[in-house]
């Protein structure tokens, strides 16, 4: 006969006692049905035992009991310290095992250490990390609405955080339902409560590196796209990207998780701001003139949270707040080697296609396509990078318009009452306004977000820099097409034609964009 050792965790019995029963060998059975089949013939024999045996009888006859593999803890040195705490000398080799408590341990000795420290009886379930047990959520109780082919779920504003299988924390279970409906995913619930932040270290020793002449450490990374999310909240192409960033910037970014970073977006309570309807039925939101910049999910900086509410009400959009503060400016370097270029009369010429795919440069100028931006850099010897695709959107520097009185007209429009005092300011669009108040009035009337570049007239603007080589009208211009849009609404075929017009206008013409008007 073989003794069967019962490590019990429940009941009023002594938790440190092992109860030994003479039974036939009980193999490890992973499936509930098999466990029930083995337990059944033993149940009748055990019913005649003493009272404490009934605990074992109950545990055996439950089909869902966790049968684990007992770890041989005698292999590891152990003892009790001077302070009375137990210790186990565990090796530092990483051989993850999953315990019967659902926790992953670095190796089998980790289970021994845990049991000794906590007086527990955890056993090994299987080798390797514990596999998360996903819980499918019943989304039928939540109202679903289909608009323009998109399914939206109406969720209650109840904060009961749950962790999704994508390692993202949702406000409640309905949040997972809403995300799945909106993005056509199948995310399930891992557990109640917020997701635990599991930070993984990256082994950078496997990537070759070199030190440049200026003392910078450069890491040679493979061109493999396997996105990882760093602890700084940025997504890197692969783990090596984190290594390269740390070496170059002297930082200590670790890997937060595999896959792209997902940003938790705080909700804005737009009900706190007063609204009114115009005669045309449009909803207007009255916002306080407080400058607390926030970044929207559309990549645009708003004066404050109310600005997002007003934008959504006016345009029927669903922009949310990405984060407090201005949107971060990110740039993308361009590969200009793919475009043909040569030099004529000392001027670099780039052959660009007649394709309108507007891009915004880091200099705040809109270019007709990537090639036009390359041509600009070649001609002027600059290093302008691509900020983003599409036309540039003006970000708002600090401009305090709250000191100017406003009034609301009968049609619902708000206007600013400005004095006739001439105190010119230069705006971020390169235009001179009669005063700061006039600039505020322009923003309110035109729904723009122009900022103040400086006090005084715009003297050293983009146009002056762009045409600095043209002291007089050039009699000959080349025929390449690199469109320039002037403030007069005219599209000029290239820099030469635009700058000639700039000189002829007594240098009052401004460059609006490097694209067709």
Curated annotation (Swiss-Prot):
Q: Which UniProt keywords apply?
A: Allergen, Antimicrobial, Disulfide bond, Glycoprotein, Protease inhibitor, Repeat, Secreted, Serine protease inhibitor
Q: Where in the cell is it found?
A: Secreted
Where in the chain are disulfide-linked cysteines found? 73-112, 90-109, 98-130, 139-177, 155-174, 163-195, 204-243, 221-240, 229-261, 270-309, 287-306, 295-327, 336-374, 352-371, 360-392, 401-440, 418-437, 426-458, 467-499, 477-496, 485-517
**In which tissues does this protein get expressed?**
Expressed in oviduct (at protein level). Expressed in egg white (at protein level). Expressed in egg yolk plasma of non-fertilized eggs (at protein level). Expressed in the magnum of the oviduct (at protein level). Expressed in oviduct. Expressed in liver. Expressed in the cortico-medullary border region of the bursa of Fabricius by the bursal secretory dendritic-like cells. Highly expressed in the magnum of the oviduct, and at a lower level in uterus. Weakly expressed in white isthmus and very weakly in infundibulum. Not expressed in duodenum and kidney.
Q: Where is this site: Reactive bond 7 for chymotrypsin and elastase?
A: 479-480
Q: How is it used?
A: The galactomannan conjugate of this protein prepared through the Maillard reaction shows almost the same inhibitory activity toward trypsin, chymotrypsin and elastase, with stronger heat and emulsion stability, and better emulsifying properties than the untreated protein. The conjugate can therefore be useful for industrial application.
What GO MF terms are annotated? ion channel inhibitor activity; peptidase inhibitor activity; potassium channel inhibitor activity; protease binding; serine-type endopeptidase inhibitor activity
Q: Which Gene3D superfamilies match?
A: 3.30.60.30
| Gene Ontology terms: cellular component | extracellular region; extracellular space; protein-containing complex
Q: Positions of the site: Reactive bond 3 for trypsin?
A: 223-224
Q: Where is the Kazal-like domain?
A: 67-132, 133-197, 198-263, 264-329, 330-394, 395-460, 461-517
The stated induction of this gene product is: Expression is regulated by dietary stress. Significantly increased expression between days 0 to 5 in egg whites of eggs laid by corticosterone-fed hens (at protein level). Decreased expression at day 14 in the magnum of the oviduct in the corticosterone-fed laying hens. Significantly increased expression by estrogen. Rapidly up-regulated within 0.5 hour after extrogen exposure with a peak at 1-4 hours and diminishing thereafter. Up-regulated during sexual maturation of pullets.
Residues the record annotates as the site (Reactive bond 6 for chymotrypsin and elastase) are 420-421
Q: SUPFAM superfamilies attached here?
A: Kazal-type serine protease inhibitors
Residues the record annotates as the site (Reactive bond 5 for chymotrypsin) are 354-355
The record's SMART domains line, in alphabetical order, gives: KAZAL
What coarse category fits the chief subcellular location reported for this protein?
secreted
Q: Indicate the transmembrane segments per the record.
A: none
Write down the position(s) of the site called Reactive bond 2 for trypsin: 157-158
Q: Where is this site: Reactive bond 1 for trypsin?
A: 92-93
What processing steps or modifications follow its translation? Glycosylated.
Q: What does this protein do?
A: Serine protease inhibitor involved in antimicrobial egg defense preventing contamination of table eggs (non-fertilized eggs) and protecting the chick embryo (fertilized eggs). Inhibits trypsin, chymotrypsin, elastase, subtilisin and a proteinase of fungus Aspergillus oryzae. Inhibits calcium-activated potassium channels KCNMA1 (bovine) and slo (Drosophila). Has antibacterial activity against B.thuringiensis LMSA 3.06.004, but not against S.aureus CIP 103 811, P.aeruginosa PAO1, B.cereus ATCC6464 or B.subtilis ATCC 6633.
Q: What is known of its domains?
A: Seems to have at least five separate non-overlapping active inhibitory domains; two for trypsin, two for chymotrypsin and one for elastase. They can be bound to the domains simultaneously.
Q: What's the protein called, per UniProt?
A: Ovoinhibitor
Q: Which organism is it from?
A: Gallus gallus (Chicken)
This protein's gene is called SPINK5
């Amino acid at each position: 006969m073989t003794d069967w050792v019962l490590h019990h965790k429940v009941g009023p019995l002594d938790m440190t006692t092992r109860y030994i029963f003479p039974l036939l060998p009980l193999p490890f059975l992973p499936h509930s049905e098999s466990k029930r089949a083995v337990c059944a013939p033993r149940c009748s024999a055990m019913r005649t035992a003493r009272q404490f045996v009934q605990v074992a009888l109950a545990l055996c006859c439950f089909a869902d009991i966790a049968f684990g593999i007992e770890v041989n803890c005698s292999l590891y040195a152990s003892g009790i310290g001077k302070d009375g705490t137990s210790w186990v000398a565990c090796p530092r080799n990483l051989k993850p095992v999953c315990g019967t408590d659902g926790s992953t341990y670095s190796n089998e000795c980790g289970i021994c250490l845990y049991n000794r420290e906590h007086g527990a009886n955890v056993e090994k379930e299987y080798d390797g990390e514990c596999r998360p047990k996903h819980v499918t959520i019943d989304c039928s109780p939540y109202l679903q609405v289909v608009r323009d082919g998109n399914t939206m779920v109406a969720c209650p504003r109840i904060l009961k955080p749950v962790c999704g299988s994508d390692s993202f924390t949702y406000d409640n279970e309905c949040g997972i339902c809403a995300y799945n409906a909106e993005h056509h995913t199948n995310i399930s619930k891992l557990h109640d409560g917020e997701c635990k932040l599991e930070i993984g270290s990256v082994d950078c020793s496997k990537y070759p590196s070199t030190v440049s002449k200026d003392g910078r450490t450069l890491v040679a990374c493979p061109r493999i796209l396997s996105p990882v999310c760093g602890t700084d909240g940025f997504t890197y192409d692969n783990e090596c990207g984190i290594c390269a960033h740390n070496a170059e910037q002297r930082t200590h970014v670790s890997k937060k998780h595999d896959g792209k970073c997902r940003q938790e977006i705080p909700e804005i309570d737009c009900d706190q701001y007063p609204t009114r309807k115009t005669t045309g039925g449009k909803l207007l939101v009255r916002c306080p003139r407080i400058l607390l910049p926030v970044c929207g999910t559309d990549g645009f900086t708003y004066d404050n949270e109310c600005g997002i509410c007003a934008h959504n009400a006016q345009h029927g959009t669903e922009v949310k707040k990405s984060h407090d503060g201005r949107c971060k400016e990110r740039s993308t370097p361009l590969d200009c080697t793919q475009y043909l270029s040569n030099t004529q009369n000392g001027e670099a010429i780039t052959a660009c296609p007649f394709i309108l795919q507007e891009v915004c440069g880091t200099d705040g100028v809109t270019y007709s396509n990537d090639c036009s931006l390359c041509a600009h850099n070649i001609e002027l010897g600059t290093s302008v990078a691509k900020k983003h695709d599409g036309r540039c959107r003006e970000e708002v520097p600090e401009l305090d318009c709250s000191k100017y009185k406003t009034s609301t007209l009968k049609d619902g429009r708000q206007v600013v009452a400005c004095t006739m005092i001439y105190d010119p300011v230069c705006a971020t669009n390169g235009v001179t306004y009669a005063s700061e108040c006039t600039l505020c009035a322009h923003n309110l009337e035109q729904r723009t977000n122009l900022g103040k570049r400086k006090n005084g007239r715009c003297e050293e603007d983009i146009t002056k820099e762009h045409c600095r080589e043209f002291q007089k009208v050039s009699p000959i211009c080349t025929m390449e097409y690199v469109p320039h849009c002037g403030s007069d609404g005219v599209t000029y075929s290239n820099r030469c034609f635009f700058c000639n017009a700039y000189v002829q206008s007594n240098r009052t013409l401004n460059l609006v964009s490097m694209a067709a008007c």
